[in-house]
UniProtKB/Swiss-Prot annotation:
Protein's UniProt name: Cytosolic phospholipase A2
Name of the gene encoding the protein in the UniProt record: PLA2G4A
Positions bearing the Glycyl lysine isopeptide (Lys-Gly) (interchain with G-Cter in SUMO2) cross-link: K541, K606
Name of one Pfam family that matches: C2
GO molecular function: calcium ion binding; calcium-dependent phospholipase A2 activity; calcium-dependent phospholipid binding; ceramide 1-phosphate binding; lysophospholipase activity; O-acyltransferase activity; phosphatidylinositol-3-phosphate binding; phosphatidylinositol-4-phosphate binding
Distribution of this protein across tissues and organs: Detected in granulosa cells after stimulation with chorionic gonadotropin (at protein level).
Modification type Phosphothreonine: residues: T268
Leading EC class: hydrolase
SUPFAM superfamilies cross-referenced by the UniProt entry: C2 domain (Calcium/lipid-binding domain, CaLB) (SSF49562), FabD/lysophospholipase-like (SSF52151)
Positions contributing to Ca(2+) 1 binding: D40, T41, D43, N65
Domain notes: The N-terminal C2 domain associates with lipid membranes upon calcium binding. It modulates enzyme activity by presenting the active site to its substrate in response to elevations of cytosolic calcium. In the presence of phosphoinositides, regulates phospholipase A2 and lysophospholipase activities in a calcium-independent way.
Length: 749
């Protein structure tokens, strides 16, 4: 049964760009002047330049010794119609050393009307005539999707997944507990969340996923969302050719073998040369390269070394029939001069789309990193491999890469890696350099002759590769500074008009109109300035943006799951975040997520941190809406923490440990162990350490399966009592109309 999606009727404001097409047809009587023609016959080509647009400089091929060349070459420019756009046309003569300018003229594009197409002659040096054919049209089909709604692919996935989940829940819960599942509308949306925490999070999440897979809970989940270390496990699992036919158990054995090696083995001269040459190809194509690219390669070589060409788009085959939960990954967009706790835009990644819900702006995964202007691709690159994204999602570790490898002795005494990571701010990792400019707008007119250009490029490549090799194998500034370590990509929102950002819950803003406790919002969880600037927009004039590890703001990927469009009923979160000790309260990240949700007017159950004082440390805690009749959209949260409690006594739920060996293997601390085998920055896990952490989280999850099942049963009943959940109602339509009127009546900047 289909229903109306109210979010698809909310208009995300954007201006259309113009596409200006130039066909360089021909020229006659090309001359270098009387004296010049006596010495040499021209080798002409044409260069086109529009300073107001990215990818602004284009050129034709050149013809040797031809004074009447016929090029018939077509070029396209994407223009902002609100700017003054001038086409600069330069006739060039190709030479071996340096090309010569034969003449330059300009054409005001504003003199053309939309829909007009005409041929225009241009005269150079009173003799040469060049004919260009030009046309101007509106780009009515941008490459970005502007919408508050989920994409059609995700909607189709959800429908298919619900059909599967309906049968899976009946099997999991039995006839009595699943009698409320009459149709797919009764199926609750269950999401699984994994936190950051380096390899500790990855290994712990591997045990969790094994338990969820074997217990049948995974078959009942619609989403699985990860951050930093958890995304590495998700990437490993979903990119594996045998998943889901082969379960996590076999894949986890491969993972244990892969992480048992010293990461320094990845830095052999032969491997480094291969990494750097690959990065050179990326850099020379016009894409930014940072240390995060290198870190992504190292993570990829460790975890998915036999599938380094895998892309995010290719993971669609794992979910195209709803056979697996949809994986969601995340990073942050940050500003160079603002703490990420104050300002950060959450970027979400799925096999279907990448984008920022805050701006209602999304793109196909293969376009991430391409050069955009006003929502249209002006230069497309190959899709970034999955390992590059893995480096971005966990880029906090590239920031302190010297600590990861243990190659620097410069760290301050008494400083733990966790403490050092907590002190990182955006200004430490984002270089405010001048490389934001485009090469084509900076370079002089003309280029060297092709042979000279190749020679120059080869020399430049050799020099760049040599510098990178020296930086990686020596104790250089690259290891000892943090600036420039953040991931960097072309700004896909360049040139858009952002008069305002959009609320994460647009319909809720106007239908609920509930009063928020200002004292609650002002209370600091980790920092007095946390989330102070989260309503501010991205800089649409910056040609590149910095993307970093989401754990630098808070370490749980709740923003992906709390989007009201996803209508999640039950969230099962697993927090592997570092704590001062095993006995420390485990709610810091969850409290930050709660505050973020309230500031964005998103429903979130009240997190009572004093439950720790009353009940002590437990394997999991359940948080429900206090007034379910009023908080109809509020999810239930089952929050698992990293704690070794019952695992010390039981080798399986209800099965006591008996032998000394069984007791000894389970007698360990996570954060109080002085040798820190589970440190956030430990990137080598011996088999015993892997098995301990993996088996601990496997046990903790299975030990609380009944808690999860009971929550699913309650969610089914909750759905049955609230059939209008996430579907349209009269109040929603009115809210949508009010929303459009409120936000679209504002004057443009």
């Amino acid at each position: 049964m289909s229903f109306i999606d109210p979010y698809q009727h909310i208009i995300v404001e954007h201006h259309y760009s113009h596409k200006f097409t130039v066909v360089v047809l021909r020229a006659t009587k090309v001359t270098k002047g009387t004296f010049g023609d006596m010495l040499d016959t021209p080798d002409p080509y044409v260069e086109l330049f529009i300073s107001s647009t990215p990818d602004s400089r284009k050129r034709t091929r050149h013809f040797n010794n031809d004074i009447n060349p016929v090029w018939n070459e077509t070029f396209e420019f994407i223009l902002d119609p609100n700017q003054e756009n001038i086409l600069e046309i330069t006739l060039m003569d190709a030479n071996y050393v340096m090309d010569e300018t034969l003449g330059t003229t300009t054409f005001p594009i504003s003199s053309m009307k939309v829909g007009e197409k005409k041929q225009v002659p241009f005269i150079f040096n009173q003799v040469t005539e060049m004919i260009l054919e030009m046309s101007l049209e509106v780009c009515s089909s941008p490459d970005l999707r502007f919408s508050m709604a989920l994409c059609d692919q995700e909607k189709a996935f959800r429908q298919q997944r619900k059909e599967n989940i309906k049968e899976n829940m009946k099997k999991l819960l039995g006839p009595k507990n699943s009698e409320g599942l009459h149709s797919t509308r009764d199926v609750p949306v269950v999401a699984i969340l994994g936190s950051g925490g380096g390899f500790r999070a990855m290994v712990g999440f591997s045990g969790v996923m094994k338990a969820l897979y074997e217990s049948g809970i995974l078959d009942c989940a619609t989403y699985i969302a990860g951050l930093s270390g958890s995304t590495w496990y998700m990437s490993t699992l979903y990119s594996h050719p045998d998943f889901p036919e082969k379960g996590p158990e076999e894949i986890n054995k491969e993972l244990m073998k892969n992480v048992s090696h010293n990461p320094l083995l990845l830095l052999t001269p032969q491997k480094i040369k291969r990494y750097v040459e690959s990065l050179w190809r990326k850099k020379s194509s016009g894409q930014p390269v940072t240390f995060t690219d290198i870190f992504g390669m190292l993570i990829g070589e460790t975890l998915i070394h036999n599938r380094m060409n895998t892309t995010l788009s290719s993971l669609k085959e794992k979910v195209n029939t709803g056979q697996c939960p949809l994986p969601l990954f995340t990073c942050l967009h940050v500003k160079p001069d603002v703490s990420e706790l104050m300002f950060a835009d959450w970027v979400e990644f799925s096999p279907f789309e990448i984008g920022m819900a805050k701006y209602g702006t999304f793109m196909a995964p293969d376009l991430f990193g391409s050069k955009f202007f006003m929502g249209t691709v002006v230069k497309k690159y190959e899709e970034n491999p999955l390992h590059f994204l893995m480096g971005v999602w966990g880029s906090a570790f590239s920031i302190l890469f010297n600590r990861v490898l243990g190659v620097s002795g410069s760290q301050s005494k008494g400083s733990t890696m966790e403490e050092e990571l907590e002190n990182i701010t955006a200004k430490h990792i984002v270089s405010n350099d001048s490389s934001d400019s485009d090469d084509e707008s900076q370079g002089p007119k003309g280029t060297e002759h092709e042979e000279a250009e190749r020679e120059y490029q080869n020399d430049n490549q050799a020099s760049w590769v040599q510098r990178m090799l020296m930086a990686l194998v020596s104790d250089s500034a690259l290891f000892n500074t943090r600036e420039g370590r953040a991931g960097k990509v072309h700004n896909f929102m360049l040139g858009l008009n952002l008069n305002t950002s959009y609320p994460m819950s647009p319909l809720r803003d106007f239908t609920m109109q509930e009063s928020l406790d200002e004292d609650e919002l002002d209370a600091a969880v980790a920092d007095p300035d946390e989330f102070e600037q989260i309503y501010e927009p991205l800089d649409v004039k910056s040609k590149k943006i910095h993307v970093v590890d989401s754990g630098l703001t808070f370490n749980l990927p709740y923003p992906l799951i709390l989007r009201p469009q996803r209508g999640v009923d039950l969230i099962i979160s697993f927090d592997f975040s570092a704590r001062p000790s095993d006995s420390s309260p485990p709610f810091k990240e969850l409290l930050l997520a709660e505050k973020w949700a309230k500031m964005n007017k998103l429903p979130f159950p009240k997190i009572d941190p004093y439950v720790f004082d009353r009940e002590g440390l437990k394997e999991c805690y359940v948080f429900k809406p206090k007034n379910p009749d009023v908080e109809k959209d509020c999810p239930t949260i089952i929050h698992f923490v990293l704690a070794n409690i019952n695992f010390r006594k039981y080798k399986a739920p209800g099965v006591p440990r008996e032998t000394n060996e069984e007791k000894e293997i389970a007698d360990f601390d996570i954060f109080d162990d002085p040798e820190s085998p589970f440190s956030t920055f430990n990137f080598q896990y011996p088999n015993q350490a892997f098995k301990r952490l993996h088996d601990l989280m496997y046990f903790n999850t299975l030990n609380n399966i009944d808690v999860i099942k009971n929550a699913i049963v309650e969610s089914i009943e909750y759905r049955r009592q609230n059939p209008s959940r996430c579907s349209v109602s009269l109040s929603s339509v009115e809210a949508r109309r009010f929303f459009n009127k409120e936000f679209l009546s504002k004057p443009t900047a």
